[in-house]
Amino acid sequence: MCKADDIDRAVQAANEAFADWREVPVVERARVMFKFKSLLEANYEEIARSVSREHGKTLDEARASVQRGIEVVEFACGIPSLIMGESIENIARNVDCETIRHPLGVCVGITPFNFPAMVPLWMYPVALTCGNTFVLKPSEKVPLTSLLIAELLIQAGIPSGVFNVVHGGKEAVDALLTHPLVKAVSFVGSTPVARYIYETGTAHGKRVQSAGGAKNHIIIMPDADMEQTVQALKASAFGCAGERCMAGSLALPVGDAADMLVPQLAQSASRMKVGRTDTGDNVDMGPVITADHRKRIEGLIQSGCAEGAELVLDGRKVSVPEAPDGFYLGPTIFDKATPKMTIVREEIFGPVLSVVRVNTLEEAIAIGRDCPYGNGAVIFTSSGRTAREFKHHFNAGMIGVNVGVPAPMAWFPFTGWNNSFFGDLHIQGRESIQFYTQQKMTMTRWFAPSKSKFQDPIWKPKS
């Protein structure tokens, strides 16, 4: 684990490399990303297997996450056409104005355990192509995949010192947040830590984008295609063992939709196979990340029972004989939960779905507006009018219609609201380019050589 002096060496190396890297033409920096993308694709299966081994995802889930990361590298390859400024010729007589974007310097990424490849790739390909240098601190729970990918970046031609990986806990984080040479910090993780990252980083003069936790609402209207809804909701709630910030953790069936949804979903989820993801067996869910995390989830399940929710499917009863000491939980479903219950208010970050029955769309939207988070929300409906009302009124940054998860896409910003995000410019999309650069306006005037008298640049209307 890195100490403060190790962090300082990494930041110093990045700062020293910045002077040369920023002067490399942006098209040449993009060519490094093209090579990097090719290497990621060539080593796709090895990276996915590393993710699966480290985190416990199924191999298919790991593959999907790696592909999402590669798409950000693909986006970064196009930065030369996206980083262009604006100009006005003759804004005054013989005066031209233009804007250009400059890199910031040393940027930092602090990333979570749940997506060891994808989330870091949300950050540094864009930062590097914009001309910055980078220090990545991945979660100490999943240290290896980041190093595997870093080796590919070196093979792609990234110069020494431009990209650095450090490992550590809070001491390492604090050293990065307070280091005077660090200009910007990107973070993805829980809301308490996201708030700490934002407050500490900005207090020390950093530009910060800090993505926190979520409680994603899924509204099911009576006119929804129930078969499609059940399959999408099952994948949303229990995919990646629920360890993702876009997991669908709260279902809000409207009217009699609940009587159709709950039994079908419980029956389908009960057939999901939970087990080891490293044996080649076809399983639907792997373990959660640690024994402590499983204990926390079990405590929240117990709170749901104690507060009066109806436990329809109990994932604590799952058995994995080939790994009796593994950190396994099966799909868990609560019905007839109420908005003030702990399982409804708190992010669980595990395979637990709570169902709150409502009478109208307006009631579902009101519950969403009362939620302290605002990452994502989804509606299942066959009505365009209903979908439009939902999109317009629901209080969240990522909205889906008839999709299980409004997944973050490389070309669009990951727009969390409320306590799901702290900062001004979001991760991914064009906003990420704005985050990793600063804008300069230049005003240029050239005098006409044949004129000897003063040439006033101020535009004056004719009298």
What are these model-derived regions, one by one?
Residues 1-2, 158, 182, 219, ...:
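Conserved C-terminal structural/oligomerization subdomain of aldehyde/semialdehyde dehydrogenase
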Residues 1-49, 53, 358:
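Short, structured beta/alpha segment
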Residues 3, 22-23, 55, 165, ...:
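A structural signal for short, well-ordered beta-strand elements
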Residues 4-7, 26, 44, 59, ...:
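Residues at or immediately preceding the N-termini of alpha-helices
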Residues 12, 34-45, 59-84:
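Long amphipathic alpha-helix in the N-terminal Rossmann-like dinucleotide-binding domain
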Residues 14, 29, 51, 73, ...:
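Residue-level signal for inorganic ion chemistry
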Residues 85-228, 282, 358, 423:
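Rossmann-like NAD(P) dinucleotide-binding subdomain of oxidoreductase/dehydrogenase enzymes
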Residues 192-338, 361, 401, 448-452, ...:
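ALDH superfamily catalytic-core signature
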